[in-house]
């Protein structure tokens, strides 16, 4: 959560899930991550990974880098809690502009600097993330 004079301007959340670190073992998306988190908790299976679920920034505070601040805070807290990995089943911001392009192709498009054409993927890449694959 990011505060500005006592008002919440940005925040986010994630769920702890067990994950082997193998791309083939990734949750298939938001719903699967949440189901895995609940099932693992109920079965006493320890989590190894934080799956980001959402980040929100108030529209009056957009374009100030607050999403990155929230993601960094969640990542820090995940590591402090002993989680080894952080994953983000994200929805690329500009994918709707290219409805006929398969997600895996879209996610591979890069600018001359080597970063994704998509601003939300780029935000994660600047934090050290890499695209592991599209959700089914």
What are these regions (language model features)?
Residues 1-12, 27-28, 126:
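Conserved beta-hairpin
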Residues 12-54, 92-117, 135-136:
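Conserved acyl-donor/pantetheine-binding loop and adjacent beta-alpha core of acyl/acetyltransferases
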Residues 57-60:
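Active-site acidic-Proline motif in GNAT/NAT acetyltransferases
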Residues 63-80, 86-88:
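Conserved acetyl-CoA-binding loop-helix of GNAT-fold acetyltransferases
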Residues 84-85, 130:
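Residue-level detector of anion-binding/catalytic polar loops
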Residues 118-126:
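Short alpha-helix
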Residues 125-134:
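Conserved acetyl-CoA-binding loop of GNAT-fold acetyltransferases
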């Amino acid at each position: 959560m990011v505060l500005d004079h006592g008002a919440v301007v940005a925040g986010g959340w994630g769920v702890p899930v067990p994950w082997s670190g193998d791309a083939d073992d990734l949750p298939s998306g938001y719903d699967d991550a949440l189901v895995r988190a609940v099932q693992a908790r109920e079965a006493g299976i320890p989590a190894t990974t934080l799956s980001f679920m959402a980040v929100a920034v108030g529209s009056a505070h957009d374009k100030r880098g607050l999403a990155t601040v929230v993601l960094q805070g969640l990542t820090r807290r995940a590591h402090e809690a002993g989680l080894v990995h952080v994953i983000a089943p994200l929805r690329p911001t500009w994918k709707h502009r290219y409805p006929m392009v398969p997600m895996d192709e879209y996610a591979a498009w890069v600018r001359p600097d080597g970063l994704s054409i998509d601003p939300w993927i780029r935000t994660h890449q600047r934090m050290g993330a890499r695209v592991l694959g599209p959700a089914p």
